[in-house]
Structure formats: structure tokens, C-alpha cells
Amino acid sequence: MVAMNADVTIEVLESADDSVLEAFVRLIPLLSGSAPVPDRERVERVLGHAGNTVFAAWGRVRAGEGERRILGLLTLVVIELPTGTEARVEDVVVGGEARGLGLGRALVLAALSAAAVRGVRYVDLTSAPRRVAARRLYQSLGFEPRETGVFRHTLDAYR
């Protein structure tokens, strides 16, 4: 657990209780209008996958108001390859009411720290050009644009 202040902490999610499921249902659609809303089984598979570490920013938008809840999420995916251990940061999302509070930065820093502990050599992420603030954040944390292209093949079962 990483403490940000008295009201916000960054924690690794281990199980899909109702509050965790509610956060995924509320936050994941903010990533993409085409992303399916995850159900409990999906969230449990994500949390239980050996290569995944899911970080949550728990807190209150305004100190002392209401119950603590998940305000943001990030998934760190560690990949063992013949060339070394690498990682990807995926599905970084902070709810609109909590944007600008430094949660994205705290989530990414927690992921980078966890990756370093696991012996990761590189951490990659992708970010759409329209996400100007997010791209600025990633660059401020040491991520550099790469001269590469991302290719995607959609399997027939998902068309």
C-alpha cells in the first residue's frame, strides 16, 4: 500500500468484492465506449492472473465526505520473454470527479515501483493522441515516445 495523504491510498486489489466490482463497472467504460462492462467473473480472472497486478486509488473526492471508494485503477501486466522481463501499463483510468488530484501519477508510480521489484527491464504503455493530459503525465514520469507502430489482429470469435 502507498499512502498519498490521509484520504487517498494506492492499494493492490486481491479480490472482487462488491466495492471492487462497482468500481470496475463505473470506471472501465470511461476508457472506451466499445469496452464491454466487466462482470464479476471477468474481474476475478483479471485479479487472479499471475502476470497482472491491479492497483486502486482508494479515497474520497473531498476529505471527510462519504465513504472511501475506488477513484482510479491501473493494471500492470508483467511479461516473461526470452529477451527479459518486461511490463505494460494498461487501463489507467481515474473517475471524472477525481481528475486533477494526482491519482494517475500515484497509480503509475506505484506500478513502476512494483515493476522494479519484479526485475522488469522496460515498462511500455500506449496512449491515444487525444489524451493530451495523460500523455503529458506519462512523459513527466520518464516515458518516452517510441518509433514503432502497434498492430492489432481481431480474432473472428470477437467480430
What are these regions (language model features)?
Residues 1-18, 156-159:
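Conserved N-terminal entry element of GNAT/NAT acetyltransferase domains
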